[in-house]
């Protein structure tokens, strides 16, 4: 019975987040005390820089440093961190890889994180708040501006789908919206003359 009770009550209390989104979401849910390590790119909220141990970049990670934190869950993102995830799994670490590519996918990620840490109601409220803000933004009448979304600079990579969707919701037009549907970042690589030819109003 004790073993069954322990399984029922299990929630990860030593989480390592290798993506910015999961860090920010846990803070917004008030579950930041569960975080023991973060990606070096985590900057929101500002206090995360002082409060949490940094364990690597986006496509690289200090595996020994992560293991030393004795995590009971590591949160990763997509195929870009597949090698890191595989190495941690081989070390016996539980890993959950998110793959959010759209606004809907982001909201789903928030819901899943809420479930993982037992903060379902707080996650539902956060999702409802975001949905309301997006609807308000969608209803605003604005000048349609052509927007170039630069996800990366070397090489130039245009924005992923959720970037493009947010621009559209705000009343703009993503000049490379056709590429935004491509999951693989390599298929969104641009040449500088393509950006010049697109003649965006906003970058």
Features from the language model and the residues they span:
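N-terminal ligand-binding lobe of clamshell/alpha-beta domains
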Residues: 1-203
């Amino acid at each position: 019975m004790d073993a069954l009770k322990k399984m029922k009550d299990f929630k990860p209390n030593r989480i390592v987040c290798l993506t910015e989104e999961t860090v920010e979401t846990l803070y917004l849910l008030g579950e930041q005390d569960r975080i023991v390590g973060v990606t070096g790119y985590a900057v929101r909220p500002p206090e995360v820089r002082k409060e949490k141990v940094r364990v690597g970049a986006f496509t690289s990670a200090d595996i020994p440093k992560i293991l030393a934190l004795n995590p009971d869950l590591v949160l990763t993102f997509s195929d870009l961190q597949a090698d890191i995830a595989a190495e941690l799994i081989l070390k016996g670490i539980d890993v959950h890889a998110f793959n959010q590519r759209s606004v809907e996918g982001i909201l789903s990620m928030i819901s899943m994180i809420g479930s993982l840490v037992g903060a379902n109601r707080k996650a539902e409220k956060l999702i409802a708040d975001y949905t309301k803000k997006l609807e308000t933004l969608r209803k605003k009448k604005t000048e349609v501006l052509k927007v170039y979304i630069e996800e990366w600079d070397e090489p130039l990579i245009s924005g992923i789908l959720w970037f493009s969707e947010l621009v559209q919701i705000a009343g703009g037009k993503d000049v490379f919206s056709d590429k935004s549907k491509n999951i693989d970042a390599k298929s969104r690589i641009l040449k500088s003359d393509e950006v010049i030819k697109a003649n965006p109003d906003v970058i």
